[in-house]
């Protein structure tokens, strides 16, 4: 069993949230954005290195810098016929 701790004080609540937030140890060398995982940093840094590489949607013609964004767009926006 475990107990649930109730925090009534606003100062304590914000302090608790700050301590429970994961540390952002991986920093982008281009814009100083912080990440908790090295993989996320690597994906982000690609946007700085190669802006000329784009992926386009065959249905609507929109362009995306990341392949994952195109895949997400296909699933949620465009209707495949």
Swiss-Prot record:
Keyword field: Developmental protein, DNA-binding, Metal-binding, Nucleus, Pair-rule protein, Repeat, Transcription, Transcription regulation, Zinc, Zinc-finger
SMART domains assigned to the protein according to its UniProt record, in alphabetical order: ZnF_C2H2 (SM00355)
Tissues in which the protein is found: Has two temporally distinct modes of expression during early embryogenesis. Expressed in seven stripes at the blastoderm stage, then during gastrulation the seven primary stripes are supplemented by seven secondary stripes which appear in alternate segments. This results in the labelling of each of the 14 segments in the extended germ band. Also expressed in the anterior gut primordium starting at stage 5 and in the embryonic foregut (including the proventriculus) and hindgut.
Chief location category: nucleus
PROSITE patterns from the xrefs?
ZINC_FINGER_C2H2_1, ZINC_FINGER_C2H2_2
Q: What GO molecular function terms would the record report?
A: DNA binding; zinc ion binding
| Taxonomic superkingdom | Eukaryota
Check the record and name the Gene3D superfamilies matching this protein.
Answer: Classic Zinc Finger
Outcome when changing residue 46 to C: In drm6; foregut proventriculus and hindgut morphologically and functionally defective. Abolishes lin binding. Abolishes lin-inhibiting activity
Q: List the disulfide bonds.
A: none
**What does the entry note on its domains?**
The C2H2-type domain 1 is essential for binding to and repressing lin, while the C2H2-type domain 2 contributes to lin binding.
Primary role: Putative transcription factor. May function redundantly with odd and sob in leg joint formation during the larval stages, acting downstream of Notch activation. Acts in a hierarchy during foregut and hindgut patterning and morphogenesis, antagonizing lin to relieve the repressive effect on bowl. Involved in cell rearrangement during elongation of the embryonic hindgut. Regulates expression of hindgut patterning genes to establish the small intestine region of the embryonic hindgut. Required in the foregut for spatially localized gene expression and morphogenesis of the proventriculus.
Q: What protein name applies here? A: Protein drumstick
Q: Give the organism, scientific name.
A: Drosophila melanogaster
């Amino acid at each position: 069993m475990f107990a649930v701790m109730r925090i009534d004080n606003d100062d304590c609540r914000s302090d608790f949230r700050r301590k429970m937030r994961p540390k952002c140890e991986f920093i982008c060398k281009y814009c100083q954005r912080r990440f908790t995982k090295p993989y996320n940093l690597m994906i982000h840094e690609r946007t700085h290195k190669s802006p000329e590489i784009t992926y386009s949607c065959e249905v609507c013609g929109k362009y995306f810098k990341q392949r994952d964004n195109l895949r997400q767009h296909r699933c949620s926006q465009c209707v495949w016929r």
